[in-house]
Structures are given as structure tokens and as C-alpha cells.
């Protein structure tokens, strides 16, 4: 029973939050309680991994849920992202939005994403994905005073419904050929015929949609922009992490006969995503939209490694980049939420930020430099691993395209940094003085993570490997 401890604890936290909806619990106590829940869930992963071998956890209790090394890594990072999301909720003055119902939905979404990353079966994966998605629709729409939030929720719901139908059709094709919907059976049961390839593409298209890769990204601009800033950060970090987790497990933990065909598709998506994301970012002046479009570029970087995995190249660069990128994005949206609340943020709103909030301004700068790939930052290390994997696999052209797009991204990230340090401040910040200290701690945490991880003093993957036996 202890091997399923993280799964059970996250489910219990969800039920407790639902029961608390009928009480008059304050926002402060609700946030503190949920942070405690997710800290316990975070610790439970290490308890489980320390007490059981990998072979035992791969086959424990159920053929549908597995706490392998990949699930362990993604589960730990997802728990950390939930904690960052909850801490960020402290710094919003919108009491009507941050009601207990919102935290119950957030807990349900966290459970769905966590369970999804543990799943090794197609139908169960979709069920947990829908649990998380339905919660997100409601969380986006809860900001009902904003017309764009209701529009964003409806658009996300409608498009997700279509993609779920495609996923189920693909799962039916896969079952018809492989005779099972378990990942391990799919890997050995599928062949290179037309039905197998179409089935896998339809299944993976759902993940492409949630990740917002090229061809599936148009929704993300409107939905993220129409969402509360904190919810947008949750989508850009936790939801993207869980979607990539399924993609990686399905394609690489259980590699099948069609992996070469899929990797060719991944290479095309990587190139198109990097260029499309940069083109969208270059013309934007809205900070949230820049970050949304830049997320498409970073997904493209991860796809470089996914298209390069082979005998001499591991999936490690993609896992490292995904884990560190989503944590940094979580920190960034949390800091922005603390500084500006839920109002629209133009680049000009960052003018002279260093004069009034030097710690947060420096954190914002370090994050932007990390996204560029500045040396001794975690972004530099991630890009080094990603581009090296492409070269080692013989796909040097992908590394070249990646470097070109990294150079393009310098323009809009430097635009933000220049605005912070070389322009006069004209806009009041929303964070109250009483909340400055906590926000500074959040900013300092992001700086330490980026520098310590990037300089090699601390490695999240090496640390997690200590618990993998």
C-alpha cells in the first residue's frame, strides 16, 4: 500500500478540500493547509523510492499505475510546482477569485496531473487528463468579471473535447492492432502499417495540443492570455510537465517499432515550433503573450532531444530541460503575479522596476538570461545538453536551428531587461508592503535555483537519482 502513497495522499487532499468548501475557512488557512498537503506528497515520493526497488515499483499492485524512475522525477517536480502555485496565491488581493472552491479545483487538477504521470495505460491516462482539464476549465472561468476569462475557458473546453475524441479514435486503432492499451504491449504489438502509425499520431496529437507545439498552439495564446496570471503559470508549467511526461513515457520508456517515424515528425515539429514561437514573440509588447509564445520555442528545444534519442543518445537532456524549465516558469509567473496581480502587463510596465523592487527585478533578469542560455545558468546547461544530443545523433542541423533561434530570442528578452533597468517607472505595483518579504524570498529562491543548478553545484536529476535503485 505504501508504494501508492503519493497517489493516495493527493486523492485524500482533494477530498478534504472539497469538504472544506462548505466551511468558512479563510484564504490564508486554506493556502497554508494545501501547501502542507503538497509538502507531504513531495516527501512521500522519497519515502516510497527509498523503501522499494525500481523493479518492484514497476509492477506493484496494478498494471495501470507505475512509480518508475520517470514518474518519480515528474511527480517530485509536479509537487514542487503545486507548492509554488499555492505560495503565489498569497500575493493576490482578489479575494473573490481565491475562494476555497478554487483551491479544491487546484487540488483536483494536481491529483489528475500526478495520476496521469503515474499511468501506463491509454484509457486511464485520458481519464486522469480529463479530471485535470475539467478542473482547469472551471479555474479559468471563475474569474467571471473578466469576459476574456469565460471566453478562454469555453475555447479551451471546446478544443480539448475535439482532441479527446481524436485521442480515443487513435486508442481504438492502437487497441485493434496491438490488442492492448498498455504502453508496454503497445510497444511490442504495433508494427509499421498505416493503421498503427495513424493510431499513434492521433494519440500523440492530444499531447501535442496540451504542450502547445507547432500546429497545435493557436489556442494557447488566447487561453493563457484570458486566464488569471497564476492559472496561466500553472498551465505553462505543471500542465506542460505532465503532458510531456506522457509523451516521453509512451514513446521512449516503451520504445516501439515506429519510433523512427515518430522522431522524424518530432524533428519537423521542433524546427517549426522554434521559428513560430520566436516570430510571435518578436512582435509582442505584452509580457504574458511574450512568455506564452516563448514557451512554444522552449517546447521546440525539448523536441530536438526527442527526435535525437537513440543508441548513443539518452532522454536525459529532455527530462533535465523540462524539469528545470517548468520550475523556472513557475517562479516567473509567481513573481509577476505578486508584483502586478491579474492586470495586463506591458513591457513598459516594467520600466524602472529595479528602483522600487531590486530583488524581484534581479530575479526577473536572471530568469530572462537563463531563458537566453547565459553561461552558468540552468538554461545554458539545458541547451548545452539538448544541442549536444542532436550533434551526437548525427542531426547537427537541429542544433544549428536551435542556436539560430536562441539568438533570435535574445531580442525580446533583452527588451525586457532594458526596460527594467534603463527606463523610468510610471506604473504602480499591486503587491502590498506587508507581502514584500515573502515575495523577496520567492525571488531569491528562483535566483539560487538557476545559478546553483546551472553552475553544477546542485543537480536536480543527480539528487533524484540518489533515490532510484
UniProtKB/Swiss-Prot annotation:
Topology of the protein relative to the lipid bilayer: Multi-pass membrane protein
Reactions listed under catalytic activity: a quinone + NADH + 5 H(+)(in) = a quinol + NAD(+) + 4 H(+)(out)
EC number: 7.1.1.-
Cellular compartments annotated: Cell inner membrane
One GO BP: ATP synthesis coupled electron transport
Presence of keyword Nucleotide-binding: no
GO molecular-function terms, A-Z: NADH dehydrogenase (ubiquinone) activity; NADH:ubiquinone reductase (non-electrogenic) activity; quinone binding
Record's keyword terms, sorted: Cell inner membrane, Cell membrane, Membrane, NAD, Quinone, Translocase, Transmembrane, Transmembrane helix, Transport, Ubiquinone
One Pfam family of this chain: Proton_antipo_M
GO cellular component, one term: plasma membrane
Transmembrane parts of this sequence: 2-22, 28-48, 70-90, 101-121, 122-142, 157-177, 194-214, 233-253, 261-281, 290-310, 315-335, 361-381, 398-418, 447-467
Reported function: NDH-1 shuttles electrons from NADH, via FMN and iron-sulfur (Fe-S) centers, to quinones in the respiratory chain. The immediate electron acceptor for the enzyme in this species is believed to be ubiquinone. Couples the redox reaction to proton translocation (for every two electrons transferred, four hydrogen ions are translocated across the cytoplasmic membrane), and thus conserves the redox energy in a proton gradient.
Complex formation: NDH-1 is composed of 14 different subunits. Subunits NuoA, H, J, K, L, M, N constitute the membrane sector of the complex.
Similarity comment: family membership: Belongs to the complex I subunit 2 family.
The name this protein goes by in its record: NADH-quinone oxidoreductase subunit N
Lineage of the organism: Bacteria, Pseudomonadati, Campylobacterota, Epsilonproteobacteria, Campylobacterales
